[in-house]
Structures are given as C-alpha cells and as structure tokens.
Amino acid sequence: MHLCHNSANISHTNSNWSRDVRASLYSLISLIILTTLVGNLIVIISISHFKQLHTPTNWLLHSMAVVDFLLGCLVMPYSMVRTVEHCWYFGELFCKLHTSTDIMLSSASILHLAFISIDRYYAVCDPLRYKAKINLAAIFVMILISWSLPAVFAFGMIFLELNLEGVEELYHNQVFCLRGCFPFFSKVSGVLAFMTSFYIPGSVMLFVYYRIYFIAKGQARSINRANLQVGLEGESRAPQSKETKAAKTLGIMVGVFLLCWCPFFFCMVLDPFLGYVIPPTLNDTLNWFGYLNSAFNPMVYAFFYPWFRRALKMVLFGKIFQKDSSRSKLFL
C-alpha cells in the first residue's frame, strides 16, 4: 500500500480558475456535449425510423452514431468536471470504469470511420461487386469488430493495469495522489494504444482516400474523354459530380478525424519517452479536441447527404409520429 505525502494539502487540490472562468468552461463544454448528443441521436432516430434508410451502409453509420452518442452521454459529462475542476471526485473504481469506457468508445468511433472508408472504397472503385461484397453480413462483422476489439483492449488493459507496468510509482505520485483520473501509459502500452486506436485505422483511412481520389479522378477523366468524342460534353458532369462528391465526403471525414485526434495521440505516445513532461491540462484539452470528432460526424452527414437534411426536418417538426411516416421517400 502506497501513502500519499502531504495528503491533507493534496486532497484539496482543485481548479485555481475563477468562478466566471469555470462557469464559461462549463457552458462551452456543455454545448459540445449537447451538440454531440442531439446530432447523433437524430442520426440514430432517422436510420431506425425510415425504412428507406435500412441499408447495410447506413447500419454502419447507425452503429457509429450510437458509439458517439454513448461517448457524449457516459464519458463527456464526467470528463467535463475533471477538466474544469482539475480534480476527480468520483472514486478510484469509477475512474477505471470511466477511463476504460472512454478508451473503448473513442477507439470504436475511430474504427467505425475506418470501416466506413472501406465501404466507400468498394462503392466508388468496385461498384459492380459492391453489393455482393458489402452485404449485411459483412457490415455485421465490421460492427462486431468495431465494438468488441476496443472493449477487450480498453477494459483488459485498464482493469488489469497493464498500462502501468513499470511506471506504477510514477502513476501513484503524479496522478493518484493528486486525485487525477486520465489515461496514463508506459512506453510499451502507449505505443500499443497508439497503434491500435489511431495509427492502424488512420493509415487505412488515408490509404483508402488516396485510392478513391485517384481512381475517381481517373474514371471521371475517362468518361469526359468518351463523351467528348461523341459530342456529349455536358453529360459528363453528372458522373463526375457523383464520384467527386464521394471523394470529398470521405476526404472531409478523414481531415476532421486527423485534425481532432492527431494532437492527442502524438502527445500520448511521446509523453512516456519525454519523461511525462506534458502537463495534464494540455492532455485534457487535446482529449476534448478528440471528442469533437464525435460532434462533427453528424455535421458531415448534414452537409453532404440530402436524406439527412430531410430526415432532420421531419424529426424536428414531429412528422415521424404521423401514420406511415416510416415509408417516406427521403431520396429517389
């Protein structure tokens, strides 16, 4: 059993920010949480309610929205208190549960993005065999992997304390005794978490986007040339627009993902090698940038998918409670 020195003083370590600053932070973070919850809840309701949206691809989007909604519901509120107060008030056991759930849901959201990019790859680059390859069974396997792998990794690592092997004393002095609660990794576990939760799925997304962009560009150029030869220049715009739109949608999803999560994961993997010099406040701030990814995902749908905008109107105006509204045509 370890003892915390000067525990009488440390036990009251909390935020040095003024009441006004803390109130502003609570308001800002509450807005982020509310945006995450409402946006993803609308995606969940829309895909669940409208029969036209019951496609394999949309069930993958539905699953990711559930992950992001749970992140906003189960993780972000407690992270908000930790961030603003600079202290963890909810006990050691709940800290482990919160950290495990945080890692699991954040990783699951990222894995869903990787699988969505694979789905888009086949849709754009192999359209003739798309429905045969990306069927309901394939989507079910993707969803199963996206949930189970992060769950086993996160809960196994945190509750077995595999992330603390070799750095137990450092964790006790720098986190536990200061009433902190945030993911703390040794060099080995940090690299493993970085590879599993960020590098591998991120590399898949970048590779797939690279392939989609150049294949779609080549297809559009070929169609352009063929139509020009028969004097149908104007008709080349429709397929080009469709392919370009698919590439742009995935490109924005990948860009938002990298912008949100890159800073956090690079600090996380480098910190053990730098002697844990990165301040917890900075880590916490970067973690919130990562959370923003879950709030931005529904905004990408709203911008690029007309069906989402139509479904949003029907949900907001209560039209989903009308008879046979589930059979409404959201697209042709």
From Swiss-Prot:
Q: Which Gene3D superfamilies match?
A: Rhodopsin 7-helix transmembrane proteins
> Which family is it part of?
Belongs to the G-protein coupled receptor 1 family.
**Gene symbol of the encoding locus:** Taar1
Protein name as annotated: Trace amine-associated receptor 1
Q: Which GO terms describe its biological process?
A: adenylate cyclase-activating G protein-coupled receptor signaling pathway; adenylate cyclase-inhibiting G protein-coupled receptor signaling pathway; G protein-coupled receptor signaling pathway; phospholipase C-activating G protein-coupled receptor signaling pathway; positive regulation of cAMP/PKA signal transduction
Please list the disulfide bridges: 4-177, 95-181
The record's Gene Ontology cellular component field reads:
endomembrane system; endoplasmic reticulum membrane; plasma membrane
Location within or outside the cell = Endomembrane system; Endoplasmic reticulum membrane; Cell membrane
**Which Pfam families does the record match to this protein?**
7tm_1
Q: What is its main location?
A: membrane
Please tell me the species this chain comes from: Rattus norvegicus (Rat)
Q: Kindly indicate whether the keyword Transferase belongs to this entry.
A: no
GO molecular function ontology, one term from the record: G protein-coupled receptor activity
> Which of the residues are on side Extracellular?
1-24, 80-97, 160-187, 271-287
